[in-house]
Amino acid sequence: MAVGKNKGLSKGGKKGGKKKVVDPFSRKDWYDVKAPNMFQTRQIGKTLVNRTQGQRIASDYLKGRVFEVSLADLQKDIDPERSFRKFRLIAEDVQDRNVLCNFHGMDLTTDKYRSMVKKWQTLIEAIVEAKTVDGYLLRVFCIGFTAKDQQSQRKTCYAQQSQVRKIRARMTDIITNEVSGADLKQLVNKLALDSIAKDIEKSCQRIYPLHDVYIRKVKVLKKPRFDVSKLLELHGDGGGKTTEAVVSAEGAVVDRPEGYEPPVQEAV
């Protein structure tokens, strides 16, 4: 048996001991996520990021984050036609504690998309790439299904290949004209109202009746060079603060941001 001191016991117990537990949230800050002014709901939530330390800037880690929000939440609407549309917003800049977002795409929920695919009908899909007036290159996916004639006794409503080609060409023409003739803000409004799909359904009635025509997905392939002034223009006053009309003593209407406080006067 070796004779000597036990170094572990002489130092007061096990090696390492109990480490001090540090709360990871103590090093993080909350930021408000702001949607562009084309939507009714401006603040869509909050996001968490590590506080700025040395060369690690918090805003650099916030830029590029993508947030997926239902259109019903963005428009404060309980219409079921809006609830299955998801809009993707990407963080492009940070002002104070506000993360300013821009449109980054649109998609349908999986349950809605799968519920539309049924037997005894023809699925027609068109994929179009077009550029907006302000330089955004988009890939638009459109989908539609042939409708059954109410007066017919047939179980199926299949379209001929020549009719499918005509409908797909009509879809491509309408989407190209709508996208290339509008800027991003106007296009997002059209997607929110689903006006493009309604125009396609109405235009294709003479070729073959359609139903469940939707813009299924929109992808942003290319963006113009980032311009802060254009992003601030999309967000109105920049920080997403709502302005209220204040009537001065002379009776003129003055727009002032929410939470405005007059400066303290040194002398009266």
From Swiss-Prot:
It holds the Pfam family Ribosomal_S3Ae. Keywords: Cytoplasm, Developmental protein, Differentiation, Oogenesis, Ribonucleoprotein, Ribosomal protein. InterPro entries: Ribosomal_eS1 (IPR001593), Ribosomal_eS1_CS (IPR018281), Ribosomal_eS1_euk (IPR027500). Residues 1-21 are annotated as: Disordered. SMART domains: Ribosomal_S3Ae. One of its GO terms (biological process) is translation. Its main location: cytoplasm. The keyword Ribosomal protein applies. It is found in: Cytoplasm. GO terms for molecular function: structural constituent of ribosome. GO terms for cellular component: cytosolic small ribosomal subunit. Essential for oogenesis; required for late follicle cell development. Component of the small ribosomal subunit. Mature ribosomes consist of a small (40S) and a large (60S) subunit. The 40S subunit contains about 33 different proteins and 1 molecule of RNA (18S). The 60S subunit contains about 49 different proteins and 3 molecules of RNA (28S, 5.8S and 5S). Belongs to the eukaryotic ribosomal protein eS1 family. This is Small ribosomal subunit protein eS1. The gene is RpS3A.
